[in-house]
Curated annotation (Swiss-Prot):
GO terms for molecular function: ATP binding; tRNA(Ile)-lysidine synthase activity. One of its GO terms (biological process) is tRNA modification. It comes from the Bacteria. This is tRNA(Ile)-lysidine synthase. Belongs to the tRNA(Ile)-lysidine synthase family. It is an enzyme of class 6 (ligase). Its main location: cytoplasm. It comes from Thermobifida fusca (strain YX). The gene is tilS. Ligates lysine onto the cytidine present at position 34 of the AUA codon-specific tRNA(Ile) that contains the anticodon CAU, in an ATP-dependent manner. Cytidine is converted to lysidine, thus changing the amino acid specificity of the tRNA from methionine to isoleucine. GO terms for cellular component: cytoplasm. The lineage of its organism: Bacteria, Bacillati, Actinomycetota, Actinomycetes, Streptosporangiales. NCBIfam families: lysidine_TilS_N.
Length: 324
């Protein structure tokens, strides 16, 4: 008897690899929008999970941003039940405005996924991000001047969130969804030039492919993997250094900092700023560099203004971040 078509076999293998270390009897939830990536993920999980002794459930989130979104969420929930998923949750969310429409929708979606996973005590939540999504994320963060940790982009595992398709190209995943008999929904936001990611996908990446040659998507995703390894090593070094120069959660010894490489200093300075209450999304590299100048270019200068009504200052040989 012949096996499944290659794209279907590939996505099943990717899901099997992601789930194989989970304890038997664990519940895994598939986040499904009804698009081709998440439908392929749902189909592969429906096949793989029971063969690994796992329970499969699903969750679909209605952001309420488009006409007909409620009916579409109902359709996706019914499809997941037909695949044998149990439980299946259909969650409606209210999308705010903080950080722009894409970021606000993402925040609302992840909050819903987290709550659903908590309620059902899920061991893992599966997300359908592909290698192409990874490449787009790298470009978006590169344009913001991000560091190694941010450029490392998405991990195959972040806490309970698993991304089985992160090493699989989008075309293969879409072929798998079609071969499984799904009729995916096409999100108009994915082709709307008002959204930055859409412009990267349909304008920037094709230009890079034409100018630099094929393989740019794979190269960007590979860069993310390499940078993740580097960032992990630097974070571990920073952990060790903090034990030596830390003076509580929001202060560091200035002389000890001065003897460390800049990559380690800036990590530690960012940590104390966050611990003091600076909002992560508002704390930029320039803020951290200004704190670093209190170490490397100390001339008795004044404090550094930071987001969240916080200040960084040098006092009694320490770099301290506190409220105004």
């Amino acid at each position: 008897m012949s096996g499944p078509p290659p794209p279907v076999a590939l996505v099943r293998t990717a899901v099997r690899r992601a789930l194989r270390d989970l304890p038997a009897g664990s519940l895994v939830l598939v986040a499904c929008s009804g698009g081709p990536d998440s439908l392929a993920l749902a189909g592969a999980t429906a096949f793989v999970a029971p063969r690994l002794g796992l329970r499969a459930g699903g969750v679909t989130v209605d952001h309420g941003l488009q006409e007909g979104s409620a009916e579409r969420a109902d359709t996706v929930a019914a499809l997941l039940r037909n695949l044998g998923f149990d439980p299946v949750e259909r969650v409606s969310v209210t999308v705010g405005t903080a950080g722009g429409p894409e970021a606000a929708a993402r925040s609302a979606r992840y909050a819903a996924l987290e709550k659903t996973a908590d309620v059902h005590q899920a061991a893992a939540v599966l997300l359908g991000h592909t290698r192409d999504d990874q490449a787009e994320t790298v470009l978006l963060r590169l344009a913001r001047g991000s560091g190694a940790r941010s450029l490392a982009a998405m991990a195959t595992r972040t806490g309970r969130y698993l991304r089985p398709f992160l090493d699989v190209d989008r075309r293969t995943v879409h072929e798998a969804a079609s071969l499984m008999g799904f009729e995916p929904w096409s999100d108009p936001h994915n082709t709307d030039p008002a959204y930055t990611r859409s412009r990267v996908r349909h304008e920037a990446l094709p230009v890079l492919e034409r100018v630099l040659g094929p393989g740019i998507t794979e190269a960007l995703a590979r860069t993310a993997t390499l940078l993740r390894d580097d960032a992990d090593a630097l974070d571990a070094w920073a952990d060790q250094a903090q034990q030596q120069v830390g003076r509580g959660p929001t202060a560091l010894d200035a002389a000890g900092l001065a003897g460390l490489p800049r990559a380690i200093r800036t990590r530690l300075l960012r940590r104390i700023a966050l611990a003091a209450g600076c909002p992560a999304g508002a704390l930029t590299a320039e803020h951290v560099f200004a704190l670093d100048r209190l170490v490397t270019e100390w001339r008795g200068q004044s404090h550094v203004d930071l987001p969240g009504a916080r200040r960084g200052r040098r006092h009694d040989g320490q770099i301290i971040v506190s409220a105004d």
